[in-house]
Amino acid sequence: MSNIILDLQLACADLQGLPAEGDFLRWLEAVLPRFRDEAEVTIRLVDEAESHELNLTYRGKDRPTNVLSFPFEAPPGIELPLLGDMVICRQVVEREAQEQNISQLSHWAHMVVHGSLHLLGYDHISDEEAEEMESLEAEIMQVLGYPDPYAAEKESD
């Protein structure tokens, strides 16, 4: 039995073709139990306008993005299973999958894995951090049965 609670919010105009809630839960279950006994996560699926607005407000980037992660920080001394929120932009994920010639489901999985690691405190600002995070992502994606999302980059190095 999973100790992960998922609040999946569908804020897209078109809900056709989105992964099922069970897919999102399976992807979270591949990441979170490695680090926490229990976790509560919100995943909000949005259109480009909302992603753009949030990316501009919180990151100063004037464009929509694939995934934004907002870790929950409990006040000192308070233990809560709340991990945080992820906001994933449907159009960006679908466009990137097409541009990278990968399956949409694989790219959705990668965005959930990537966003989950951000919620857990991982980042990719420095090369060292990026290498650690990308290695974890590749390992988790393989466990899920998907290809290494960074394979093309590694081949070109």
Swiss-Prot record:
Pfam families: YbeY (PF02130). GO terms for biological process: rRNA processing. GO terms for molecular function: metalloendopeptidase activity; RNA endonuclease activity; zinc ion binding. Gene3D superfamilies: Metalloproteases ('zincins'), catalytic domain. It comes from the Bacteria. Its cofactor is Zn(2+). Keywords: Cytoplasm, Endonuclease, Hydrolase, Metal-binding, Nuclease, Ribosome biogenesis, rRNA processing, Zinc. One of its GO terms (cellular component) is cytoplasm. Zn(2+) binds at residues 114, 118, 124. PANTHER family: ENDORIBONUCLEASE YBEY, CHLOROPLASTIC (PTHR46986:SF1). Single strand-specific metallo-endoribonuclease involved in late-stage 70S ribosome quality control and in maturation of the 3' terminus of the 16S rRNA. This is Endoribonuclease YbeY. It comes from Edwardsiella ictaluri (strain 93-146). The lineage of its organism: Bacteria, Pseudomonadati, Pseudomonadota, Gammaproteobacteria, Enterobacterales.
